A protein has these predicted regions:
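Beta-strand elements of well-folded, non-transmembrane domains
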Residues: 110-116
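A solvent-exposed, acidic/Ser-Thr-rich amphipathic alpha-helical stretch
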Residues: 39-109
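Short, intrinsically disordered, charge-balanced linker/junction segments flanking boundaries
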Residues: 118-124
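Short secondary-structure boundary micro-motifs
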Residues: 5-8, 18, 43-45, 78-82, ...
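Residue-identity detector for glutamine
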Residues: 12-15, 46, 98-99, 114
Length: 124
């Protein structure tokens, strides 16, 4: 059995990446956010209910390139301005679950809390 500490360096790097990613979003550095992705990287948000039901698709958001992520930032800055809010991402339990010479897969848990300018709180 491999040591549970064998992946610590990679897990710390993943944790640092996720922290920086969240910091961009939480501190209104939206223009920096797409730089956490490769040019043809995918970003999608799928409702947990769809995953639990075994449904493929039904995404809230589905972006397939860094250019689409930049478009999302433009939309947030200039179009979707009706409901301004502050957000905080809390990320825990980062774990590398699979690794080879060139790639790895990591899982984590997160909680997103949004507070709008009127004081309404949503946790996602």
């Amino acid at each position: 059995m491999a040591s549970p500490f064998a992946e610590t360096t990679i897990e710390q790097a993943v944790q640092n990446l996720l922290n920086e990613y969240a910091d961009c979003l939480d501190n209104d550095r939206l223009e920096e956010w797409p730089e956490h992705f490769i040019e043809d990287g995918c970003y999608f948000v799928q409702p947990r209910e769809n995953i639990d039901a075994g449904l493929d698709g039904g995404y809230w958001m589905y972006h397939t390139s860094k250019a689409m992520l930049r478009d999302r930032v433009t939309s947030l800055r200039h179009i979707n301005t009706y409901n301004k809010y502050y957000c905080r991402h809390l990320i825990t339990n980062v774990k590398v679950v699979q690794q080879d010479d060139e790639n790895f897969e990591a899982n984590s848990n997160f909680l997103l809390v949004q507070v709008n300018f009127e004081g309404k709180i949503d946790s996602i």
